[in-house]
Regions:
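N-terminal Lys/Arg-rich, disordered targeting/topogenic segments
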Residues: 1-17
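An N-terminal hydrophobic leader/cap segment in hydrolases
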Residues: 18-64, 71
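Membrane-embedded segments
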Residues: 65-141, 145, 151, 163
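Short gly/ser/thr-rich secondary-structure transition/capping motifs
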Residues: 63-70, 195-200
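The feature captures the conserved acid-bearing segment of alpha/beta-hydrolase catalytic domains
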Residues: 195-215
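Proline-centered loop/turn at the N-terminus of a beta-strand
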Residues: 110, 152, 175-176, 213-215
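Short glycine-enriched, charge-decorated loop/helix-capping segments at active-site entrances
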Residues: 125-128, 192-197
Protein backbone atom coordinates (compact mmCIF):
# COMPACT_ATOMS: atom_id res chain seq x y z
CA UNK A 1 0.00 0.00 0.00
CA UNK A 2 2.79 2.39 0.98
CA UNK A 3 4.67 1.57 -2.24
CA UNK A 4 1.58 2.31 -4.29
CA UNK A 5 1.14 5.64 -2.53
CA UNK A 6 4.75 6.58 -3.27
CA UNK A 7 4.30 5.63 -6.91
CA UNK A 8 1.13 7.70 -7.13
CA UNK A 9 2.88 10.72 -5.61
CA UNK A 10 5.79 10.39 -8.06
CA UNK A 11 3.34 10.04 -10.93
CA UNK A 12 1.55 13.23 -9.86
CA UNK A 13 4.80 15.17 -9.44
CA UNK A 14 6.79 13.90 -12.40
CA UNK A 15 4.34 12.07 -14.66
CA UNK A 16 4.79 8.67 -16.22
CA UNK A 17 8.30 7.92 -17.43
CA UNK A 18 8.69 7.48 -21.16
CA UNK A 19 11.56 7.81 -23.60
CA UNK A 20 9.56 10.37 -25.55
CA UNK A 21 9.15 12.49 -22.43
CA UNK A 22 12.85 12.15 -21.65
CA UNK A 23 13.85 13.23 -25.17
CA UNK A 24 11.53 16.24 -24.99
CA UNK A 25 13.14 17.27 -21.71
CA UNK A 26 16.65 16.91 -23.15
CA UNK A 27 15.70 18.94 -26.24
CA UNK A 28 14.17 21.66 -24.06
CA UNK A 29 17.27 21.87 -21.85
CA UNK A 30 19.56 21.96 -24.89
CA UNK A 31 17.47 24.69 -26.55
CA UNK A 32 17.54 26.75 -23.35
CA UNK A 33 21.32 26.30 -23.11
CA UNK A 34 21.75 27.47 -26.72
CA UNK A 35 19.50 30.47 -26.12
CA UNK A 36 21.34 31.48 -22.95
CA UNK A 37 24.79 31.00 -24.48
CA UNK A 38 23.90 32.99 -27.60
CA UNK A 39 22.39 35.99 -25.84
CA UNK A 40 24.11 36.14 -22.45
CA UNK A 41 27.55 34.51 -22.75
CA UNK A 42 29.42 37.75 -23.34
CA UNK A 43 28.22 39.01 -19.97
CA UNK A 44 30.09 36.07 -18.45
CA UNK A 45 33.16 36.32 -20.68
CA UNK A 46 33.75 40.04 -20.14
CA UNK A 47 33.93 41.30 -16.57
CA UNK A 48 35.33 44.85 -16.60
CA UNK A 49 36.68 45.75 -13.16
CA UNK A 50 35.40 48.76 -11.27
CA UNK A 51 37.96 51.38 -12.11
CA UNK A 52 38.76 54.81 -10.73
CA UNK A 53 41.06 55.33 -13.68
CA UNK A 54 41.05 58.80 -15.25
CA UNK A 55 42.60 59.77 -18.54
CA UNK A 56 46.12 60.98 -17.81
CA UNK A 57 48.76 62.38 -20.13
CA UNK A 58 49.95 58.82 -20.67
CA UNK A 59 46.61 57.73 -22.14
CA UNK A 60 46.24 57.81 -25.92
CA UNK A 61 42.80 57.87 -27.52
CA UNK A 62 42.46 55.87 -30.73
CA UNK A 63 39.44 55.24 -32.93
CA UNK A 64 38.08 51.71 -33.19
CA UNK A 65 36.42 50.62 -36.43
CA UNK A 66 32.92 51.45 -35.17
CA UNK A 67 33.95 55.06 -34.49
CA UNK A 68 34.23 54.76 -30.71
CA UNK A 69 37.37 55.84 -28.87
CA UNK A 70 39.39 53.36 -26.86
CA UNK A 71 42.20 54.08 -24.43
CA UNK A 72 45.77 52.96 -24.97
CA UNK A 73 49.18 53.42 -23.39
CA UNK A 74 52.55 53.42 -25.10
CA UNK A 75 55.78 52.84 -23.22
CA UNK A 76 58.57 53.45 -25.75
CA UNK A 77 62.02 51.98 -25.32
CA UNK A 78 64.70 53.52 -27.58
CA UNK A 79 66.94 50.46 -27.15
CA UNK A 80 64.22 47.97 -28.06
CA UNK A 81 64.02 46.20 -31.40
CA UNK A 82 60.52 44.80 -30.75
CA UNK A 83 57.27 46.33 -29.53
CA UNK A 84 54.85 44.21 -27.49
CA UNK A 85 51.20 44.73 -28.45
CA UNK A 86 49.52 43.62 -25.23
CA UNK A 87 45.90 42.42 -24.87
CA UNK A 88 44.91 41.98 -21.22
CA UNK A 89 42.61 39.53 -19.44
CA UNK A 90 38.86 39.67 -18.97
CA UNK A 91 38.89 41.18 -15.46
CA UNK A 92 41.78 43.62 -16.00
CA UNK A 93 42.22 47.10 -17.38
CA UNK A 94 45.15 49.38 -18.14
CA UNK A 95 45.16 50.86 -14.66
CA UNK A 96 45.58 47.43 -13.09
CA UNK A 97 48.34 46.18 -15.39
CA UNK A 98 50.64 49.22 -15.49
CA UNK A 99 53.18 47.38 -13.38
CA UNK A 100 53.16 44.46 -15.84
CA UNK A 101 53.68 46.79 -18.79
CA UNK A 102 56.57 48.54 -17.04
CA UNK A 103 58.21 45.21 -16.25
CA UNK A 104 57.96 44.21 -19.91
CA UNK A 105 59.48 47.54 -20.95
CA UNK A 106 62.27 47.20 -18.39
CA UNK A 107 63.07 43.73 -19.74
CA UNK A 108 64.00 45.24 -23.11
CA UNK A 109 60.83 45.87 -25.13
CA UNK A 110 58.67 48.79 -26.11
CA UNK A 111 55.06 48.23 -25.04
CA UNK A 112 51.69 49.26 -26.45
CA UNK A 113 48.55 48.19 -24.57
CA UNK A 114 44.91 49.11 -24.91
CA UNK A 115 41.57 48.71 -23.16
CA UNK A 116 38.73 46.91 -24.90
CA UNK A 117 35.52 48.82 -25.44
CA UNK A 118 33.72 49.11 -22.10
CA UNK A 119 36.93 48.74 -20.08
CA UNK A 120 38.68 51.54 -18.20
CA UNK A 121 37.93 54.80 -19.97
CA UNK A 122 37.24 53.22 -23.36
CA UNK A 123 33.84 53.93 -24.87
CA UNK A 124 31.34 51.27 -25.94
CA UNK A 125 30.54 47.77 -24.75
CA UNK A 126 32.79 44.71 -24.84
CA UNK A 127 32.05 41.89 -27.26
CA UNK A 128 34.04 39.31 -29.17
CA UNK A 129 33.69 41.23 -32.43
CA UNK A 130 34.61 44.53 -30.78
CA UNK A 131 37.85 43.08 -29.39
CA UNK A 132 38.88 42.29 -32.98
CA UNK A 133 38.07 45.86 -33.97
CA UNK A 134 40.00 47.20 -31.00
CA UNK A 135 43.19 45.23 -31.61
CA UNK A 136 43.06 46.23 -35.28
CA UNK A 137 42.86 49.87 -34.16
CA UNK A 138 45.86 49.38 -31.87
CA UNK A 139 47.83 47.60 -34.61
CA UNK A 140 47.03 50.31 -37.16
CA UNK A 141 48.09 53.01 -34.72
CA UNK A 142 51.39 51.24 -34.13
CA UNK A 143 52.17 50.70 -37.80
CA UNK A 144 50.70 53.87 -39.31
CA UNK A 145 51.03 56.55 -36.62
CA UNK A 146 54.13 55.35 -34.81
CA UNK A 147 55.76 53.74 -37.84
CA UNK A 148 56.56 50.41 -36.18
CA UNK A 149 57.21 47.71 -38.82
CA UNK A 150 54.82 44.75 -38.58
CA UNK A 151 57.74 42.33 -38.27
CA UNK A 152 58.88 44.18 -35.15
CA UNK A 153 55.53 43.75 -33.38
CA UNK A 154 55.08 40.83 -30.99
CA UNK A 155 51.41 40.26 -30.24
CA UNK A 156 50.82 39.20 -26.62
CA UNK A 157 47.43 37.94 -25.38
CA UNK A 158 46.60 36.99 -21.82
CA UNK A 159 43.43 35.02 -20.93
CA UNK A 160 40.56 36.39 -23.05
CA UNK A 161 43.16 38.62 -24.71
CA UNK A 162 44.42 35.51 -26.46
CA UNK A 163 41.34 35.73 -28.69
CA UNK A 164 42.09 39.08 -30.35
CA UNK A 165 45.84 38.37 -30.26
CA UNK A 166 45.49 35.09 -32.17
CA UNK A 167 42.95 36.62 -34.54
CA UNK A 168 45.31 39.46 -35.45
CA UNK A 169 48.34 37.19 -35.79
CA UNK A 170 46.36 34.89 -38.10
CA UNK A 171 45.74 37.82 -40.47
CA UNK A 172 48.92 39.90 -40.20
CA UNK A 173 52.58 39.02 -40.65
CA UNK A 174 53.75 40.08 -37.22
CA UNK A 175 57.05 39.33 -35.56
CA UNK A 176 55.65 36.79 -33.12
CA UNK A 177 52.75 35.69 -30.94
CA UNK A 178 52.72 35.03 -27.19
CA UNK A 179 49.62 33.44 -25.63
CA UNK A 180 49.30 33.21 -21.84
CA UNK A 181 46.55 31.33 -19.97
CA UNK A 182 44.14 31.40 -22.90
CA UNK A 183 41.77 28.72 -24.26
CA UNK A 184 40.96 26.77 -27.43
CA UNK A 185 37.50 28.41 -27.51
CA UNK A 186 35.30 30.22 -25.02
CA UNK A 187 32.63 27.55 -24.62
CA UNK A 188 35.11 24.69 -24.50
CA UNK A 189 36.43 26.09 -21.26
CA UNK A 190 33.39 24.33 -19.76
CA UNK A 191 33.12 21.32 -22.08
CA UNK A 192 35.93 19.30 -23.59
CA UNK A 193 33.94 18.71 -26.77
CA UNK A 194 31.90 21.24 -28.79
CA UNK A 195 28.23 20.73 -27.90
CA UNK A 196 26.76 23.96 -29.30
CA UNK A 197 26.28 24.88 -32.97
CA UNK A 198 28.23 28.11 -32.39
CA UNK A 199 31.10 29.33 -30.24
CA UNK A 200 33.12 32.43 -29.39
CA UNK A 201 36.85 33.07 -29.68
CA UNK A 202 37.45 29.87 -31.62
CA UNK A 203 41.22 30.14 -31.23
CA UNK A 204 41.80 26.51 -32.14
CA UNK A 205 40.65 27.18 -35.71
CA UNK A 206 42.85 30.27 -36.10
CA UNK A 207 46.12 29.28 -34.47
CA UNK A 208 47.06 27.11 -37.46
CA UNK A 209 46.91 30.16 -39.72
CA UNK A 210 49.58 32.00 -37.72
CA UNK A 211 52.83 32.04 -39.68
CA UNK A 212 54.88 33.86 -37.04
CA UNK A 213 56.76 32.18 -34.17
CA UNK A 214 54.35 31.23 -31.37
CA UNK A 215 55.07 30.93 -27.66
Amino acid sequence: MANNNRKNIKRLLFGEFSWKRLMRSIIFIYAFLCFYAFFFSEGLIFQPPSSSQNDSREVIKINSANGLKISAIHFPNPQAKYTILYSHGNAEDLDGILWVLREIRDSGFAVFAYDYQGYGTSQGRPSEYNTYRDIDAAYNYLTQQLGVPAKQIIVYGRSVGGGPAIDLASRQSVGGLVVESSFVSAFRVLTQIPILPFDKFVNIDKIGKVRSPVL
